């Protein structure tokens, strides 16, 4: 589900301060827990090893802490508030809009050869890497396609790189396709959506590890309201208005 800000609290003193810190620091997606734990394990091993051997292993502890901190930042899962008006399509990912054009949806979805409006978002290593539903509706297709791990910001990535495509149909019959695309560093696509799932706009449905790209295919005739070079915020930035 979409992560939304909590209601205002009436707590005071240390409890209020702790709550402010929690609200300012984004939670971590569960997919990041093993990576953070590994970094902390290295830190612990350095501490224990220094006690046992007497050797200076501060460098090992620092490496472990640095790795754990980096993973916590990468797997952050901040709150987002999707638009409340009907008929909008929001960005499925944080990042830079790198392509706005028309293209045929992935062949594995069997949607024919008609070109559809497409908006592509490139996620750098520093962006939030959870993906969110661009629109409310039912998942009617999920297809994984193996492929290369080329640079995700280049045009061939959409057709040649490893990808997972999700096709969503709204209650009114409109369809939107969102495609998770692997990149040079992104070697693991995680998709939690399954056929028959009912998604609400802004719901978290997947994650790509370490740099990637998201392609969103819009209904025929749709005019995107964003521009190439614009920053997109997953679950909040409106890509198009279908009304």
From Swiss-Prot:
Its cofactor is pyruvate. Heterodimer of a large membrane-associated beta subunit and a small pyruvoyl-containing alpha subunit. It is an enzyme of class 4 (lyase). The active site is at 212 (schiff-base intermediate with substrate). It comes from Mycobacterium leprae (strain TN). This is Phosphatidylserine decarboxylase proenzyme. Pathway: Phospholipid metabolism; phosphatidylethanolamine biosynthesis; phosphatidylethanolamine from CDP-diacylglycerol: step 2/2. The modification Pyruvic acid (Ser) is found at residue 212.
